[in-house]
């Protein structure tokens, strides 16, 4: 299973019952952005990587799941590096199709398949998962102060602590060991993973905080992704809206990409740290282990392990 896809439970069931070798296929409105299946006599005959728009060999793309047995593992040995410097499982599948009939399993119409290869795709996937989770259970197991207010569907896991004068608006997920408050505000579609923290006078809006991420005081985290064990200094703010209300762009592999979103904050990699009173522009990415000095306005991406000093803010 590729790590950059999100699929529903029905997809796993369909693949588990399929005969090996088999691959998952999906229909998308932009097939030229993916590996497109070549079909021969109704079966799989190979994959064309990112064909020219309008010249796709079919309307099915390789959807990131493969089922094989030990009989097929040799096809994945000694693969050459592709032009983009990766070992492509699709090359092995194309070779395999010359010797075996490879079954095509389509994503069931009643189920979901999402490409989550871009940072903002996680927001769509997390909403689907949160909706699924709230259908399974809507529970409050953690320690909730009688002076806190909870409205709407939420999951608050065992070991979480909701302190006085905190307001949580569902749908929301509060994981085990999470600490919220006092005087904090968690808005709809927020997900706080285990041992993360939203402290005094902090607001979390439609954001994802990964394990151990800390927004301990006077922070605004809007439409943002905060990686594991990030620590945000007091007063760190993520801007999530342009003055002109236009869609926000993000740099992906060196190119500016229109996300199509009018609300999008920052993407902060694991173990990064910000000093006090840091302001981060919409669509900015901060790499893992980066340091942002106090008082800085961050207008550009910061590389993994980078150090951003305030005199760089105007460059």
Pin down the residues of each PLM region.
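Glycine-rich hexapeptide-repeat left-handed beta-helix
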Residues: 198-315
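Conserved beta-loop-beta/alpha segment of the NTase-like Rossmann-fold superfamily
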Residues: 1-41, 77
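Extended, small-residue-rich solenoid/repeat segments and analogous flexible loops
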Residues: 88, 94-185
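Hydrophobic/aromatic residue at the end of a short beta strand that borders the catalytic acidic motif
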Residues: 1, 6-8, 68, 232, ...
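Catalytic-core segments of class I nucleotidyltransferases/pyrophosphorylases
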Residues: 16, 44-131
């Amino acid at each position: 299973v590729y790590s950059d896809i999100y699929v529903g439970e029905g997809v796993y069931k369909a693949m588990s019952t399929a005969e090996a070798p088999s691959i998952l296929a999906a229909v998308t409105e932009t097939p030229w952005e993916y590996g497109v299946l070549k079909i021969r006599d109704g079966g799989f005959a190979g994959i064309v990587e990112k064909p020219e728009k309008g010249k796709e060999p079919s309307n099915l793309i390789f959807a990131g799941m493969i089922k094989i047995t030990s009989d097929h593992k040799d096809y994945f040995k000694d693969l050459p590096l592709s032009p983009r410097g990766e070992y492509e499982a699709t090359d092995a599948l194309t070779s395999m199709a010359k010797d075996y009939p490879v079954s095509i399993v389509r994503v069931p119409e009643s189920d979901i398949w999402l490409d989550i290869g871009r940072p903002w795709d996680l927001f769509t996937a997390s909403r689907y998962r949160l909706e699924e989770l709230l259908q399974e259970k809507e529970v409050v197991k953690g320690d909730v102060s009688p002076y806190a207010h909870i409205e709407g569907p939420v999951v608050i896991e065992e070991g979480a602590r909701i302190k006085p004068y905190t307001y949580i608006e569902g749908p929301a997920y509060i994981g085990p060991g999470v600490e919220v408050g006092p005087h904090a505000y968690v808005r709809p579609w927020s997900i706080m993973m285990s041992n993360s923290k939203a402290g005094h006078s902090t607001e979390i809006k439609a954001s994802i905080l990964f394990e151990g991420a800390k927004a301990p005081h006077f922070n605004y985290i809007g439409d943002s992704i905060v990686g594991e064990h990030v620590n945000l200094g007091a007063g760190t703010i993520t801007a999530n809206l342009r003055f002109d209300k236009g869609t926000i762009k993000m740099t992906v592999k060196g190119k500016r990409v229109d996300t199509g979103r009018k609300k999008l904050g920052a993407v902060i990699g694991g173990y990064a740290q910000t000093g006090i009173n840091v302001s981060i522009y919409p669509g900015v990415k901060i790499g893992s282990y980066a340091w942002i000095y106090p008082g800085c306005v961050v207008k550009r991406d910061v590389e993994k392990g980078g150090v951003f000093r305030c005199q760089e803010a105007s460059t």
